[in-house]
Amino acid sequence: MTVPLHLGVRAHDFGQIPLADLTRKLQQYEFSHIQFAIKKSFPQSASSLSALSPGTATYYGNAFRRAGIQIAVLGCYVNIVAPDPQTEAQALADFKTHLRLARDFGASLVGTETGSVGQGYTTDNFTEEAFQRVIAAVSKMVAEAERFGVTVGIEAGLNHPLHTAPLARRLLDAIPSNNLQIILDCANLMSPDNYLRQDEVVDEAFELLGNRIAVIHLKDFIVQDGKIQMVPVGQGWLKFEPILRYMKYERPHIQGIMESTTEPHLAESVAFLKQVYENV
């Protein structure tokens, strides 16, 4: 019997719509799980991330549970290496709040990228100093996760201090805790310099990160004017065959989360992924 493809989506890719409409749409597209960032989907319920209460978490967690939808990733995408110490401290506090409330949301993994040591893009992100700041911040996050029995999911991001699979492996080796896992987004590993070698880049990620990959983001890209641009799944240049083959045979039942594919393109993108998955 073929292992089914477990597909989900970022809730905020539907925009800011009423909760009942969101759950109805998720059921309509037969998504079994979501990545949920409350500030992006329901900002009125999160005046500040650190002010979230168990009641807020339970309210949304119960609503998704009743609809048969699991929160696979509780999104708290904050800048954990912000240039301003006060901003960095607030980012870590917000993330720790999500770790504390994860179980009330019905989630076990809280996810983020690493951010930027400058305002926006800077080559300073590619320094050893920036990477050491990532280790310092993630160490604090993982210590808190261990207290609450939940997991930190770190995602490599284009032009972030953590932007390659080898750096993600270094992070895992530097923080020897199973409460630290990787959210793998193969599109985020692409750059104008390496996308023509994407088979090699993706194979390296699977080899280096292996069973420390908790969730896989499914996103597509093109290169335009020398820069990576994200496009709906199936409309770009990412080769999904090796990714879906890995999901089907190496990590059966691992959850995939579609990203940067808005509703006008969802049906076509879902059909594309299911077709590729069936054929690999």
Predicted regions: what they are:
Residues 266-280:
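C-terminal helical cap(s) of enzyme catalytic domains, especially alpha/beta-barrels
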Residues 233-236, 243-257:
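H/E-rich (His + Asp/Glu) clusters that bind or coordinate divalent metals
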Residues 37-59, 117-120:
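Glycine-rich, proline-tolerant flexible connector loops at the mouths of alpha/beta enzymes
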Residues 20-40, 106:
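Catalytic domains of carbohydrate-active enzymes, especially glycoside hydrolases
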Residues 4-9, 34, 40, 139-237:
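Acidic/histidine-rich catalytic cores of soluble enzymes
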Residues 15-26, 90-99, 198-206:
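Short, acidic/polar
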Residues 20-21, 58-59, 63-66, 81-182:
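Active-site acidic/histidine proton-transfer and metal-coordination neighborhood
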